[in-house]
């Protein structure tokens, strides 16, 4: 069975990647199994950060690696929070504060069109000159208030127009069928 290191310590992400790659007879090994620290996300785009993370894992493990960088883009805010989605409020991983800051910035703004972005990068080794790349997008709108208890991040304020529900109001199973990450993973699986 082929092994790929996942540049993540996020348990939900590890579970999602493990289940999807198992179908291709590929074993996902989280970077935490190798005591690999998170790479510094110094890129200016999702794809740059994904490549940095994948190369960091490959460097420290000697194995092929895959990484994603994801976030939310609100069009009327010139793509904010973008690559800073997880630390939008200044504190990394504080979902509640990130949501509050975004809703405050959108007060009085009727243009709430947004999308989730997932950029994936796969490298065979640290110096791979041609990483395999894939993007996934999920279009929607930003709600005026939090709704739903499933998911994480901006899910409670991201409305799916076709369902008129937030991502936090649908099941994890349904979300994993339509999410930006699921779309990007499907694309990259076809290239591996």
Swiss-Prot record:
Gene Ontology CC terms, in alphabetical order: cytosol
CDD domains on file: HAM1
The protein, known as: dITP/XTP pyrophosphatase
Subunit relationships: Homodimer.
Cofactor binding note: Binds 1 Mg(2+) ion per subunit.
UniProtKB keywords: Hydrolase, Magnesium, Metal-binding, Nucleotide metabolism, Nucleotide-binding
Residues at the catalytic site: 69
Residues that hold Mg(2+) according to the record: 40, 69
Keyword Phosphoprotein set for record: no
Residue ranges that the Swiss-Prot or TrEMBL entry lists as coiled coil: none
Classification via PANTHER family: INOSINE TRIPHOSPHATE PYROPHOSPHATASE (PTHR11067:SF9), INOSINE TRIPHOSPHATE PYROPHOSPHATASE/HAM1 PROTEIN (PTHR11067)
Top-level EC class as recorded in UniProt: hydrolase
UniProt family annotation: Belongs to the HAM1 NTPase family.
Molecular-function annotations in GO: dITP diphosphatase activity; ITP diphosphatase activity; metal ion binding; nucleotide binding; ribonucleoside triphosphate phosphatase activity; XTP diphosphatase activity
Cofactor: Mg(2+)
Record's keyword annotation contains Nucleotide-binding: yes
InterPro entries: dITP/XTP_pyrophosphatase (IPR020922), ITPase-like_fam (IPR029001), RdgB/HAM1 (IPR002637)
């Amino acid at each position: 069975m082929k092994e790929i290191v996942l540049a993540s310590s996020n348990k939900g992400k590890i579970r999602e990647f493990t289940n999807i790659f198992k179908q291709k007879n590929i074993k996902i090994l989280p970077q935490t199994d190798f005591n690999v620290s998170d790479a510094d996300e110094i890129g200016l785009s999702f794809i740059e950060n994904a490549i940095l993370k994948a190369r960091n894992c490959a460097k420290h493990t000697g194995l092929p690696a895959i990484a994603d960088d994801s976030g939310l883009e609100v069009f009327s805010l010139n793509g904010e929070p973008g690559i800073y989605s997880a630390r939008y409020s200044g504190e990394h991983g504080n979902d509640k504060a990130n949501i509050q800051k975004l809703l405050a910035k959108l007060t009085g703004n009727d243009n709430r069109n947004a999308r989730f972005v997932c950029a994936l990068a796969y490298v065979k080794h640290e110096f791979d000159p041609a990483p395999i790349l894939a993007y996934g997008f999920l279009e929607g709108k930003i709600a005026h208030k939090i709704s739903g208890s499933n998911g994480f991040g901006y899910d409670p304020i991201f409305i799916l127009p076709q369902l008129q529900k937030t991502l936090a109001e649908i099941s994890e199973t349904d979300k994993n069928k339509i999410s930006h990450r699921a779309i990007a993973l499907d694309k990259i699986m076809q290239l591996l």
